């Protein structure tokens, strides 16, 4: 069967024009040619990308005349001698080459332009985008913020984002920022290497007696190797090494700050097949944490696996299966009956809420699990259960040794297929204990019900109807009615526009 390479070969043969650069583009390699230097009548063009493509060059001389010619920047610098002083030059003036960074296609370099929200990057300005934001959590209250960033589409190699918020309840400046740089490769093994540094800090509690606001900070440098796959395969994979440092203010036990040093080696593999999409995450995590002089330092080494597979069984109808397992290969607190607190961190949680998110990876309205409404927010990491029991019942479904789970969700096989109503069922096993003197023993949990899901996991509401005994006992002890069992979730990481535009383009 003919493929795109056959078409390009035929056009090359008939036109006598080298089109190998377009073959590189179709193979997923970026175009980034740059006017790197202009001195008198000499112009230097550098190919910063991994595709060699013919593109027009428009030169304006100081005497007012213009000249237009086609150039083909290779992997070496292309130096053109014009013997007349050059006033300005534009590479690819008609924007037909799919160059990912049109800002460096001009001499002189463009000035700064301010744009609101998003759009295609302007070739005549160095765009800075502004987006006003509003947020909320239980301790900062309503937050007003402004997100500033330098790249939308096509994504630049150097990207940054600064998003400060002001919390009206905390009277604090909070928020997050990051900067990243991509090194692209023309290789059948490596697509790019991304270097990234992020920082995030929000309030986590308040000490009303001392009238101080407690907050956390997370700093996470990361290097990610993006493997190359033929775009026609619908596969994508990456391997990342991340070092996280977290510091959490504490107002009791004479401890000022609880710190963690977490190292994560993670491999992700995605298959964007329409009929059977699936993804795999394998992660090895080492954590050394310390709660001041009051407690000894502790550490662990944890291996986890997360596999998700979807089965399309009708138009707009899908069954999703998720398998999760995690095991502590080493844990100095394996025999502890404390979970995700000062005494024992990194515990495997079948039921995830704000107080189990020990590395501050996600966004929660309430991280203490005590707010009457906000604590009903759950996360899909770990065991992926849809129940919210609060921090007072935080020992349920947690383990410092081993846990595994299966999560099922499906559209209804009848009725309107486009309705977001689904059924779910979660089952899990955890080796756990209630008291430190007890031996570790396996416990089984399950929960099933109905859910409303928007955006394939972006936002969801869940109503558990059938639950295992321990979960049922908590519901009964708190006299929960049907409405008070409803939980909600949101996965804001799925809204990352830079990953959507540059990586997950299937």
What are these regions (language model features)?
Residues 134, 192-212, 219-226, 249, ...:
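C-terminal outer-membrane beta-barrel translocator/porin domains of Gram-negative envelope proteins
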Residues 2-93:
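Beta-strand-rich binding/interaction modules
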Residues 317-331, 343-350, 455-506:
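Predominantly the C-terminal beta-signal and adjacent terminal strand-loop region
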Residues 308, 376-387, 403, 412-414, ...:
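Outer-membrane beta-barrel transmembrane domain signature
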Residues 162-185, 203-205, 435-473:
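Strand-loop-strand
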Residues 63-76, 80-192, 221-229, 252-276, ...:
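Outer-membrane beta-barrel initiation region
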Residues 126-138, 144-152, 156-168, 191-209, ...:
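Transmembrane beta-strand segments that form the barrel wall of outer-membrane beta-barrel proteins
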Residues 126, 140-144, 171-175, 191-193, ...:
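Residues that define the transmembrane beta-barrel architecture of outer-membrane proteins
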């Amino acid at each position: 069967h003919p493929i795109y390479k056959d078409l390009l070969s035929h056009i090359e043969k008939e036109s006598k024009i080298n089109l190998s650069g377009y073959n590189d583009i179709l193979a997923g390699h970026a175009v980034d040619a740059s006017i790197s230097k202009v001195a008198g009548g000499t112009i230097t063009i550098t190919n910063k990308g991994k595709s060699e493509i013919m593109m027009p060059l428009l030169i304006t001389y100081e005497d007012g005349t213009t000249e237009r010619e086609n150039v083909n920047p290779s992997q070496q610098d292309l130096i053109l001698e014009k013997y007349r002083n050059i006033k300005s030059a534009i590479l690819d003036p008609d924007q037909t080459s799919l160059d990912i960074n049109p800002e460096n296609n001009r001499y002189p370099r463009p000035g700064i332009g301010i744009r609101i929200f998003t759009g295609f990057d302007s070739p005549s300005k160095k765009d800075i985008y502004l987006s006003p934001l509003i947020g909320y959590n239980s301790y900062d209250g309503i937050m007003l913020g402004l997100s500033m960033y330098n790249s939308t589409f096509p994504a630049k190699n150097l990207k940054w984002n600064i998003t400060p918020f002001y919390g009206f309840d905390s009277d604090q400046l909070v928020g997050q920022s990051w900067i990243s740089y991509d090194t692209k490769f023309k290789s059948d093994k490596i697509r790019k290497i991304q270097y990234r540094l992020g920082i995030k800090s929000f309030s986590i509690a308040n000490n009303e007696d001392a009238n101080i606001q407690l907050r956390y900070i997370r700093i996470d440098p990361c290097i990610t190797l993006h493997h190359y796959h033929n775009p026609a395969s619908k596969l994508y994979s990456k391997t990342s090494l991340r070092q996280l440092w977290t510091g959490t203010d504490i107002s009791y036990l004479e401890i000022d700050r609880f710190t963690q040093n977490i190292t994560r080696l993670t491999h992700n593999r995605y298959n964007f097949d329409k009929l059977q999409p699936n993804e795999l995450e394998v992660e090895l995590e080492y954590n050394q944490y310390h709660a001041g002089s009051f407690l000894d330092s502790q550490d662990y080494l944890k291996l986890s696996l997360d596999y998700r597979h979807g089965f399309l069984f009708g138009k707009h109808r899908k069954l999703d299966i998720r398998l999760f397992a995690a095991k502590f290969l080493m844990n100095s607190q394996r025999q502890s009956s404390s979970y995700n607190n000062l005494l024992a961190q990194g515990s495997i949680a079948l039921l995830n809420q704000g107080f189990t998110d020990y590395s501050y990876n996600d966004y929660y309205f309430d991280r203490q699990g005590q707010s009457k409404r906000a604590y009903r927010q759950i996360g899909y990491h770990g065991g992926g259960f849809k129940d919210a029991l609060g921090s007072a019942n935080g020992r349920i479904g947690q383990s410092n040794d081993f846990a595994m789970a299966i999560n099922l969700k499906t559209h209804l096989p009848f009725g309107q297929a486009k309705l977001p109503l689904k059924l779910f069922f979660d089952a899990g096993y955890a080796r756990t204990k209630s008291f430190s003197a007890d031996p570790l023993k396996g416990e089984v949990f399950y929960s099933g019900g109905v859910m409303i899901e928007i955006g394939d996991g972006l936002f969801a509401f869940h109503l558990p109807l059938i639950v295992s005994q321990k979960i049922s006992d908590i519901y009964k002890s708190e006299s929960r009615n049907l409405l008070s069992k409803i939980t909600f979730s949101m996965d804001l990481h799925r809204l990352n526009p830079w990953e959507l535009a540059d990586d997950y383009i299937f």
